[in-house]
Amino acid sequence: PYQPCIVLEDYKEANTVVERTEDGCCVSGIFDFMTAHFGDGEADLSRQVGAYLRENPALADEFAQTYIQCKPIQIGFIERQQLYMLYDSILIWAFWQEHAGGLPEDKTLAFEQWATPFINYWDKFRNAQTWNAG
């Protein structure tokens, strides 16, 4: 039910170049293709939403709400996002364990305790969804 595209697994503001146009702004460049593969483009929401959740939860909500309003989402969107958030959480957790001996904010935090808020984040949008059955 999705159009395969390039999924970066690290799509976030810091890896994009945005250009002003007459119609507003558009992404004109992307960096960091090291983990890129073909897949479901929705997978790239997880890294940016996760970053916003850590830095500014209100911005995460605004980003997610705007995405849902602007893009017709397919049935199963919430469940897929939970899996994508789990996968991204595993990647981030593994990186920090290997390179710093734990998460910068708290090296004693267990994975489940740290990852659960990210994995469950999309639950709040279950009743606000605009479904596209196509």
Explain the meaning of each model-derived region.
Residues 1-43:
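Active-site acidic catalytic loop and adjacent metal/ATP-binding pocket
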Residues 23-25, 46-48, 109-110:
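Glycine-rich, phosphate-binding/catalytic loops in enzymes
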